[in-house]
């Protein structure tokens, strides 16, 4: 193996490993809201994640459901009262006019390809 090939292989391994260094912090940890209210959940990354962010909703006993990907794009079938925004290290999920079916847990996820 040539020196150039070895260097490229090491660089590729370093770049792949670097992706795992991002830490995500979501707030608030818990939230109390009523039907009709507007709710905003924020997610902060420890480094620029270039809009590679997804939001999920999970109801008790069910699998998480994708709401938003690429920070701002609504997944198919997601009501327009949901919206994602942000860039760089700061992101948010906003739910306008909260509906009974919106109650559950919400999670942000940093990803490196479309979920």
From Swiss-Prot:
Keywords: Adaptive immunity, Disulfide bond, Immunity, Immunoglobulin, Signal
Keyword Signal: yes
Region annotation Complementarity-determining-3: where it falls in the sequence: 109-115
Any one of the GO CC terms: immunoglobulin complex
Superkingdom as given in the UniProt entry: Eukaryota
One GO-annotated biological process of the protein: adaptive immune response
Cysteines joined through disulfide linkages: 43-108
Protein name as annotated: Immunoglobulin kappa chain variable 12-41
């Amino acid at each position: 193996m040539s020196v150039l090939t070895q260097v490229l292989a090491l660089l590729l391994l370093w770049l792949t490993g670097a992706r795992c260094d991002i830490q995500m912090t979501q707030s608030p940890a818990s939230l109390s809201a009523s039907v009709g209210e507007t709710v905003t959940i924020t997610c902060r990354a420890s480094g620029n994640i270039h809009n590679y962010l997804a939001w999920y909703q999970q109801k008790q006993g069910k699998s998480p459901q994708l709401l938003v990907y690429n920070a701002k794009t609504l997944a198919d079938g997601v009501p327009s009262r949901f919206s994602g925004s942000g860039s760089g290290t700061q992101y948010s999920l906003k739910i306008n006019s909260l509906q009974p079916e919106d109650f559950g847990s919400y999670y942000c996820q940093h990803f490196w390809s479309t979920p």
